[in-house]
A protein has these predicted regions:
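Flexible "cap/lid" loop of the alpha/beta hydrolase fold
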Residues: 25-60, 100-107
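Active-site nucleophile elbow and catalytic-triad environment of alpha/beta-hydrolase enzymes
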Residues: 92-114
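Short beta-strand/loop motif that positions the catalytic acidic residue
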Residues: 117, 123-125, 129
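Catalytic active-site module of serine/aspartate enzymes centered on a nucleophile-bearing elbow/loop
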Residues: 147-179
Length: 179
């Protein structure tokens, strides 16, 4: 049988591209890049949280050694993330590929008209996502004409959060219900 696909953020964009050309049994897009690309969220971050915006720029230019863990927490985790885990994950952050950043800006919108309409699809949002807000995440579900759900209290990296089991259970339950 075709695979069940789960993609997060940029990986959700990869899943959308896959669906344009290949069958799948089901797909879940977790905190996906919005159809408008990164520009709206980047602008919102630059105006609303300039320190966070500056930290992203420093990290992109110089790597994880420039990351302030408090800012990293605001960026991708909820307030519930334990300090030790936050420090461990912050050290593992790497610069994004310039090509990938370009693709997420210029080619961010999936092309659902190319995909099979029979693939059950679900969009999962993180309620406290500083990168992609609920409206932007909902736009992905609207584009694909599929269901959408928000997990309150979760940061962008919901699969690493202390409450990751809630995200996993939500996905598993939906896959079973989708058949």
């Amino acid at each position: 049988p075709p695979p069940i696909l789960v993609g997060h953020s940029m990986g959700a964009l990869v899943v959308q591209r896959y669906l344009e050309q290949h069958p799948a049994s089901a797909a879940v897009l977790m905190a996906p890049v919005p159809p408008q690309g990164l520009w709206p969220s980047t602008l919102r971050m630059a105006v609303g949280d300039p320190l966070l915006y500056a930290q992203y720029g420093l990290m992109q230019a110089f790597g994880s050694g420039m990351i302030d863990t408090d800012v990293a927490q605001r960026a991708i985790f909820s307030e519930q993330m334990p300090d030790q885990a936050l420090t461990t994950y912050a050290r593992r952050v790497q610069r994004e590929s310039q090509r990938a950043l370009w693709d997420m800006n210029v080619h961010a919108a999936g092309r659902p008209w190319l995909a099979s309409k029979s693939v059950p699809l679900r969009v999962l949002a993180a309620g406290d996502d500083a990168l992609f807000n609920l409206e932007e995440t909902r736009a992905v579900a609207s584009l694909w004409g599929c269901g959408w759900q928000s997990l309150p209290g979760m940061g962008h990296a919901m699969m690493l959060e202390p409450g990751w089991q809630q995200a996993a259970d939500t996905i598993i339950r939906w896959i079973w219900e989708a058949g």
